[in-house]
């Protein structure tokens, strides 16, 4: 019962007895809780306990105060006289601070009943947790009193505590003047006074409704009393709109559980691409990794797998520091922006955004460009830099698509995009910022073409960053460029080929390639050669065949798989994914950041794809991918790996080169220069003037044709997909969607763009079997009829007729012409423009 109380200690003098004290408590009860009139009561401590409330040991005596005049409270109960009203005193004990509740400590407790020493007043705790005066004939039986309401034996001087340090009491008349309990009672539930008929079962209640409410509340109090302390019992039971908790700490515990569950849900969404890595440590003892992984569910672990295969793990000392698990966590977050090197154009720097984080790896997205160009790398990669790095180092930064280079500013760009630049401390600090001695921009050297390893070409140092430099092949496209250090086995000083009897490929379009002389070329270009002493010798690696490790799947870069060393060279190893066909094997440098010792995934929190088991189906019936073990997990719209199951089927071919010479790689039999059926075509294409050069330089790979971009260009140059022709019967339309529209990313794509012919014909059936030579002879009406056959382009066909576009003009149209000049919507324009590209591709294929 909430209310305000005021205590007054009045010192009075009666006769000659000085120091006599009168104590009274005046309460003003809330009208919400009870409507009975406020009264005044006195509590008299015994002589022994008089000092407890800091009163003198003199006799305490009752001093009667007149009642306040009755106030109209709006209650319906009849007003009775003062002398005939039954009066009940209520004392609210203090819950906290038992030692300071001096007034309550004067009560003596036994079996849940308190007795005021020196009087016949008795008290008990009602359903509200407050003290209530009871008469002798209304004393509850001892067995009905709960243990939680009783005082422990031997501690009779300590009483239950109350909610506040206040006494709420009513006027207590002399015991002889109290009316009998059989006649007038005080309702234990609502507080109203009523005349008991003596026949009702609940004599302490004014109605059956109050009696029932008291029973329900008593059940709650009794249930909680058995598991709570005396101080907790005295707490009033509040009504809850939420669920009732069985223990005081249950609510807090459940709240903590809910917070933990919500946190786990956030982590699961943020790491939706992460399954639990395998359990393993560097010492080959099982160590559980974070998350909940596929291999964990299957019970896969490195320790058991090595024992099962009787294999050995590649020792740690064979790996470079950046290949071993870093001591630092990956602090990059999705949405952070930074600067980085384009892996397809290593000489160009772009603005990148973190699109996905997985363990110590992350997927980066080129701002303003399609997701098909996204790529994966480690958080400590030297290819990424903080925002503003290009200004500090004097490099040229390619702005996002739609921005002009001279107008771009990091500060404004971050404001416009409402993004955050990746903090500088997240980037790995290199050991040295000094350029490798002897290597300067513009110096010449001889370098191996990484895409065609049989070729050693004339090259130039075009950039130097920290301890690395960029190798560029003279007069070739920058797609062949690569970064390396002085110990790279792919670079040699000028004259190395002549000393070792190796053929040297001169710069493209060099006037007299058969008589190339370094001294003459250096004089013509005004350049100098890198001194021989600047080159360092890298010792061979120590990897052995069948050693186990973890490697990134090049066809699905988001995956890291269990792998074995299939073959070795001095500085390269051949990777084989355990359980997979050898068709997917590939060569990689022994110091490449995409290979790691066993347990790297577990330590960095990256999921590891376990070996493919024979029990696993080759592919699900509806997966659309015939690759063994493929779970139909698509790439991130990657143009290069949009069909990750494809690779050249020619034995011994690693996919390098192309029979036409227009591509640096191939993925099908028709483009393979090593295929028997293509040998005749390859020989026929060789002219007499090129025969001697190709016989000297070409060992299984065609000599590259010039594909360099002429003139200046803005933004990122277009990238074209290189996909072979295969049986596409099981490929779904969803998988073909990206391939169809990627060819129209650039308004002026290369004529040599390789297209997925059969795949596109399914979505554009009208182009099947038609070449550009045939289309060039079309009339205006034939162009009109063709556009009408394209799904969704019926309304646009009339525009071509109105503009009087014949076949030859039709082939000259670009995507920009169709959209901007002819005002064709983007969807139909893409279909029409892709049809034009396919006509041209069909014509080139026949040639």
Curated annotation (Swiss-Prot):
Stretches annotated zinc finger (CCHHC-type): 639-682
Keyword Metal-binding carried by entry: yes
SUPFAM superfamilies: CCHHC domain (SSF103637), SAM/Pointed domain (SSF47769), Tudor/PWWP/MBT (SSF63748)
Alphabetical UniProt keywords: Chromatin regulator, Metal-binding, Nucleus, Repeat, Repressor, Transcription, Transcription regulation, Zinc, Zinc-finger
Compartment(s): Nucleus
Recorded domain comment: The MBT repeat 2 specifically recognizes and binds monomethylated and dimethylated proteins. In contrast, it does not bind trimethylated proteins. The MBT repeat 1 does not bind methylated peptides but inserts a proline ring in a Pro-Ser-Ser/Thr sequence context.
Assembly mode: Homodimer.
Function according to Swiss-Prot or TrEMBL: Polycomb group (PcG) protein that specifically recognizes and binds mono- and dimethyllysine residues on target proteins, thereby acting as a 'reader' of a network of post-translational modifications. PcG proteins maintain the transcriptionally repressive state of genes: acts as a chromatin compaction factor by recognizing and binding mono- and dimethylated histone H1b/H1-4 at 'Lys-26' (H1bK26me1 and H1bK26me2) and histone H4 at 'Lys-20' (H4K20me1 and H4K20me2), leading to condense chromatin and repress transcription.
Record-given protein name: Lethal(3)malignant brain tumor-like protein 1
């Amino acid at each position: 019962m909430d209310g305000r109380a005021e205590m007054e200690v009045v010192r009075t003098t009666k006769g000659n007895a000085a120091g006599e004290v009168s104590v009274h408590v005046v309460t003003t009860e809330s009208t919400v809780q009870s409507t009975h009139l406020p009264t005044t009561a006195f509590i008299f401590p015994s002589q022994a306990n008089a000092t407890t409330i800091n009163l003198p040991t003199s006799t305490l005596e009752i001093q009667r105060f007149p009642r306040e005049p009755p106030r109209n409270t709006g209650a319906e109960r009849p007003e009775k006289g003062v002398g005939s009203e039954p009066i009940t005193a209520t004392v609210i004990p203090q819950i906290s601070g038992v030692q300071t509740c001096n007034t309550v400590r004067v009560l003596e407790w036994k079996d849940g009943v308190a007795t005021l020493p020196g009087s016949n007043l008795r008290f008990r705790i009602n359903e509200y947790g407050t003290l209530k005066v009871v008469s002798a004939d209304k004393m509850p039986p001892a067995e009905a009193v709960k243990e939680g309401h009783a005082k422990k034996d031997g501690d009779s001087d300590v009483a239950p505590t109350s909610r506040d340090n206040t006494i709420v009491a009513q006027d207590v008349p002399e015991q002889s003047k109290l009316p009998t309990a059989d006649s007038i009672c005080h309702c234990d539930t609502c507080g109203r006074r009523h005349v008991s008929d003596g026949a009702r079962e609940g004599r302490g209640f004014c109605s059956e409704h109050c009696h029932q409410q008291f029973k329900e509340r008593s059940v709650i109090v009794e249930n909680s009393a058995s598991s709570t302390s005396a101080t907790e019992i005295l707490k009033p039971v509040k009504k809850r709109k939420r669920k009732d908790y069985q223990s005081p700490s249950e609510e807090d515990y459940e709240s903590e559980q809910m917070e933990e569950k919500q946190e786990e849900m956030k982590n699961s969404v943020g790491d939706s691409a992460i399954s639990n890595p395998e359990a393993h440590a560097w010492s080959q003892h099982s160590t559980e990794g974070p998350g909940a992984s596929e291999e964990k569910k299957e019970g896969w672990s490195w320790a058991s797998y090595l024992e099962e295969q009787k294999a050995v793990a590649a020792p740690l000392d064979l790996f470079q520091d950046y290949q071993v698990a870093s001591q630092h966590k990956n602090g990059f977050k999705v949405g952070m922006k930074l600067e980085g090197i384009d892996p397809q154009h290593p000489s160009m720097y772009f603005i990148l955004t973190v699109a996905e984080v997985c363990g110590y790896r992350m997927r980066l997205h080129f701002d303003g460009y399609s997701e098909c160009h996204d790529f994966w790398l480690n958080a400590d990669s030297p290819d990424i830099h903080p925002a503003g790095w290009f200004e500090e180092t004097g490099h040229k930064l390619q702005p996002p698509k739609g921005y002009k280079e001279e107008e771009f500013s990091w500060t404004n760009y971050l404001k416009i995009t409402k993004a955050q630049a990746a903090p500088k401390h997240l980037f790995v600090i290199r050991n040295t910022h000094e350029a490798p001695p002897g290597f300067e921009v513009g110096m010449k050297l001889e370098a191996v073409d990484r895409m065609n390893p049989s070729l050693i070409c004339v090259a130039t140092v075009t950039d130097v960053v920290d301890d690395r430099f960029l190798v560029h092949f003279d007069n070739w496209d920058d797609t062949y460029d690569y970064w390396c250090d002085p110990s790279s086995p792919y670079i040699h000083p000028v004259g190395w080929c002549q000393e070792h009897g190796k053929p040297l490929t001169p710069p493209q379009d060099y006037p007299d390639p058969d008589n190339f002389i370094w001294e003459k070329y250096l004089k013509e270009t005004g350049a100098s050669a890198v001194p021989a002493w600047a080159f360092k010798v890298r010792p061979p690696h120590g990897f052995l065949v069948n050693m186990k490790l973890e490697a990134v799947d090049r066809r699905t870069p988001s995956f890291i798989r269990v792998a074995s060393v299939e073959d070795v060279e001095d500085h390269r190893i051949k990777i084989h994914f355990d359980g997979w066909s050898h068709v997917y094997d590939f060569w990689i440098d022994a110091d490449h950041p995409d290979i790691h010792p066993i347990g790297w995934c577990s330590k960095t929190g990256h999921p590891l794809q376990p070996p493919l088991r024979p029990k696993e189906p080759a592919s699900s019936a509806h997966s659309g991918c015939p690759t063994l073990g493929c779970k139909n997990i698509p790439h991130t719209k990657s143009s290069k790996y949009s069909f990750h199951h494809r690779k050249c089927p020619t034995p011994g071919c690693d996919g390098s080169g192309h029979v036409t010479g227009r591509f640096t790689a191939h993925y099908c039999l028709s483009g393979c220069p090593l295929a028997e059926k293509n040998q005749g075509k390859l020989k026929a294409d060789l002219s007499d003037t090129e025969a001697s050069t190709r016989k000297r330089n070409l060992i299984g790979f065609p000599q590259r044709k010039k594909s360099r971009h002429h003139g200046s260009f803005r933004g990122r140059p277009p990238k074209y997909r290189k996909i072979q022709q295969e049986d596409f019967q099981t490929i779904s339309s969803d998988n073909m969607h990206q391939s169809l529209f990627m060819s129209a990313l650039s308004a002026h794509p290369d004529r040599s763009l390789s297209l997925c012919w059969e795949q596109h014909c399914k979505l554009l059936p009208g182009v099947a079997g038609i070449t550009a030579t045939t289309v060039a002879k079309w009339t205006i009406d034939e162009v009109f009829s063709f556009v009408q056959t394209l799904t969704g382009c019926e309304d646009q066909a009339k525009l071509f007729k109105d503009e009087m576009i014949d076949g030859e003009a039709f082939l000259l149209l670009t995507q920009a012409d169709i959209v901007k000049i002819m005002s064709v919507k983007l969807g139909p324009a893409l279909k029409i423009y892709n049809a034009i590209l396919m006509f041209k591709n069909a014509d080139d294929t026949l040639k």
